[in-house]
From Swiss-Prot:
<keyword id="KW-0539">Nucleus</keyword>
<comment type="subunit">
    <text>Component of pre-catalytic, catalytic and post-catalytic spliceosomes. Associates with the spliceosome prior to recognition of the 3'-splice site for step II, probably during catalysis of step I.</text>
</comment>
<feature type="cross-link" description="Glycyl lysine isopeptide (Lys-Gly) (interchain with G-Cter in SUMO2)">
    <location>
        <position position="349"/>
    </location>
</feature>
<keyword id="KW-0862">Zinc</keyword>
<keyword id="KW-0007">Acetylation</keyword>
<feature type="zinc finger region" description="CCHC-type">
    <location>
        <begin position="118"/>
        <end position="135"/>
    </location>
</feature>
<keyword id="KW-0863">Zinc-finger</keyword>
<feature type="compositionally biased region" description="Acidic residues">
    <location>
        <begin position="235"/>
        <end position="248"/>
    </location>
</feature>
<comment type="similarity">
    <text>Belongs to the SLU7 family.</text>
</comment>
<feature type="modified residue" description="Phosphoserine">
    <location>
        <position position="227"/>
    </location>
</feature>
<comment type="function">
    <text>Required for pre-mRNA splicing as component of the spliceosome. Participates in the second catalytic step of pre-mRNA splicing, when the free hydroxyl group of exon I attacks the 3'-splice site to generate spliced mRNA and the excised lariat intron. Required for holding exon 1 properly in the spliceosome and for correct AG identification when more than one possible AG exists in 3'-splicing site region. May be involved in the activation of proximal AG. Probably also involved in alternative splicing regulation.</text>
</comment>
<dbReference type="InterPro" id="IPR021715">
    <property type="entry name" value="Slu7_dom"/>
</dbReference>
<dbReference type="GO" id="GO:0034605">
    <property type="term" value="P:cellular response to heat"/>
</dbReference>
<protein>
    <recommendedName>
        <fullName>Pre-mRNA-splicing factor SLU7</fullName>
    </recommendedName>
</protein>
<feature type="region of interest" description="Disordered">
    <location>
        <begin position="77"/>
        <end position="100"/>
    </location>
</feature>
<dbReference type="GO" id="GO:0016607">
    <property type="term" value="C:nuclear speck"/>
</dbReference>
<feature type="compositionally biased region" description="Basic and acidic residues">
    <location>
        <begin position="20"/>
        <end position="44"/>
    </location>
</feature>
Length: 586
């Protein structure tokens, strides 16, 4: 069978350019091998022309043979080529061009008057089926009526972009959209010019420009500072400055003085740190960190509170910097006294130790103060009122009106909250909401539950309490039972007897179950004691054997000991500290 296959392959016609010889490859002679190697050397040196592939491209002679040799399954003709090393066209992905993009604003101009085969049975569009239709389900579909057929939706193309195409920020941008912005700016400029021309015409009609031109100082190039025309112009310029921001468009700055438009101008009025004092001997500026710790105005004689910038040193003393320094100082002092604490190694331990130290320090000061006062006295001098009240005069000037309000001076008022809740109205001494009872809010001073009521004081409290007593008496009278009939009394008696019988049965069951449980516990404890005695005996025998001859014994058990086993262990355990243990052993 193999011979017939070989004959059939040999008999097959071969094309001229792609002749495939299935004959056995002939072995190269020594002379042919030598000539081939010499030709390769000449090509590498550039003395012989390089090999050319089927596309007319030169093959680099320095490429190794394992790269340049063609596999038999790609090209059996064994022609010189590097096509197998290049990207294969059938495996290359097809990407969309940079000009392609999704279509926007596609109008549905096509009108369909007849149902088409394969369209949606509900609306008649060709782009989807009935189960994917978003239109409201019709009672009779477009397939059967043939009327009101919906137009086909525009199917957006599936765009596949390469690496650069995905990151192209201008892909899909229409340059014609920018013309709308240009037209808007042109309209604003035209409106400004129209307003300016209209103002000039009004001034010319009123004669202001003629008067200004005919003035003698204007002819000599001088201006009248106090003239009415200049005042009018100044007022107009002020109005233009006032409303210039309303006329501005984003990205431009309108200067009303120069009548020009400056676009994209960023005005920075802040001063750099290194420009505040140009003296080279002033505060040092570090360009790497952009920091200037010292005050640049230190040598200028200015007060640091008056200048806008006084250096970056204030940042070093803000936040927890001071407390951190105090904690570090405490750690050093504690380490000198033998305490092993460190700010970086044990920060939590140091913080707790420092807090306890501060508490003890305050307590020690208080105790020292109390002991001194107790020993020498003088507590009454510490409780004395301030010197202003003792002397009954102050240097604070206060001027009052006839109504009692302060006109000048400082008023020593009671510190109250800024909120409205602390406002006391209608002679109340407590605020609304200071008293609560039975789900209602009121005033604590009179127990009134009405917000805008007047305060009645203790009398109001007594009235509220008396009303509560009357209400309780009424409810107590209502709760008195009505007289019962003989039938109702008999039924209640039967119910009570049934309840008593049930209680007796339950008690009997409980007593019997308790006795059974005690017997079971006693038996379990007896078994546990026997097992514990056997274990102790086994341990005693094992300890008498030589250590090298003892058998393997594992103390590990997977189960947890029961309560009876623990009780037996406690009862049999030897206590050498007990003075009566020796008597019990005898």
């Amino acid at each position: 069978m193999s011979a017939t296959v070989v004959d059939a392959v040999n008999a097959a016609p071969l094309s001229g350019s792609k002749e495939m010889s299935l004959e056995e490859p002939k072995k190269m002679t020594r002379e042919d091998w030598r000539k081939k190697k010499e030709l390769e050397e000449q090509r590498k040196l550039g003395n012989a022309p390089a090999e050319v592939d089927e596309e007319g491209k030169d093959i680099n002679p320095h490429i190794p043979q394992y790269i340049s040799s063609v596999p038999w399954y790609i090209d059996p003709s064994k022609r010189p080529t590097l096509k197998h090393q290049r990207p294969q066209p059938e495996k290359q992905k097809q990407f969309s061009s940079s000009g392609e993009w999704y279509k926007r604003g596609v109008k549905e101009n096509s009108i369909i008057t007849k149902y088409r085969k394969g369209a949606c049975e509900n609306c008649g569009a060709m782009t989807h089926k009935k189960k994917d239709c978003f239109e409201r389900p019709r009672r009779v579909g477009a397939k059967f009526t043939g009327t009101n057929i919906a137009p086909d939706e525009h199917v957006q193309p599936q765009l596949m972009f390469d690496y650069d195409g995905k990151r192209d920020r201008w892909n899909g941008y229409n340059p014609e959209e920018h013309m709308k912005i240009v037209e808007e700016y042109a309209k604003v400029d035209l409106a400004k010019r129209t307003l300016k021309a209209q103002k000039l015409q009004e001034e010319l009609a009123s004669g202001k420009l003629v008067e200004q031109a005919n003035s003698p100082k204007h002819q000599w190039g001088e201006e009248e500072p106090n003239s009415q025309t200049e005042k009018d112009h100044n007022s107009e310029d002020e109005d233009e400055d006032k409303y210039a921001d309303d006329i501005d468009m984003p990205g431009q700055n309108f200067d009303s003085k120069r009548r020009i438009t400056v676009r994209n101008l960023r005005i920075r009025e802040d001063i750099a740190k290194y420009l505040r004092n140009l003296d080279p001997n002033s505060a040092y500026y570090d360009p790497k960190t952009r920091a200037m710790r010292e005050n640049p105005y230190a040598n200028a004689g200015k007060n640091p509170d008056e200048v806008s910038y006084a250096g970056d040193n204030f940042v070093r003393y803000t936040g927890d910097t001071i407390s951190m320094a105090q904690t570090q100082l405490f750690a050093w002092e504690a380490y000198d006294r033998g305490s092993e604490v460190h700010l970086q190694a044990d920060p939590t331990k140091l913080e707790l130790l420092y807090k306890s130290f501060k508490v003890k320090k305050e307590d020690f000061k208080e105790q020292q103060k109390e002991s001194i006062l107790e020993k020498y006295g003088g507590q009454e001098h510490l409780d004395a009122p301030p010197a202003e009240l003792l002397l009954a005069q102050t240097e604070d000037y206060v001027e009052y009106s006839r109504h009692g309000t302060v006109i000048k001076g400082q008023e020593r008022a009671v510190a109250c909250s800024k909120y409205e809740e602390d406002v006391k109205i209608h002679n109340h001494t407590h605020i609304w909401g200071s008293y609560w009872k039975e789900g209602r809010w009121g005033y604590k001073c009179c127990h009134s539950f009405f917000k805008y009521s007047y305060c009645t004081g203790e009398a109001g409290k007594e009235i509220v309490n008396s009303e509560e007593c009357i209400i309780n008496d009424i409810t107590g009278d209502e709760s008195v039972k009505k007289p019962q009939t003989l039938m109702e009394l008999h039924q209640e008696k039967l119910k009570e007897e049934k309840k008593k019988k049930k209680k007796k049965k339950k008690k009997h069951r409980k007593s019997s179950s308790d006795s059974d449980d005690e017997e079971k516990k006693h038996e379990k404890l007896k078994k546990a004691l026997n097992a514990e005695e056997a274990r102790l005996l086994h341990v005693k025998e094992t300890m008498q054997i030589d250590e090298r001859k003892r058998p393997y014994n594992s103390i590990y058990e997977t189960r947890e000991p029961t309560e009876e086993e623990m009780e037996a262990y406690r009862m049999k355990r030897q206590r050498p500290d007990d003075p009566m243990a020796s008597f019990l052993g005898q």
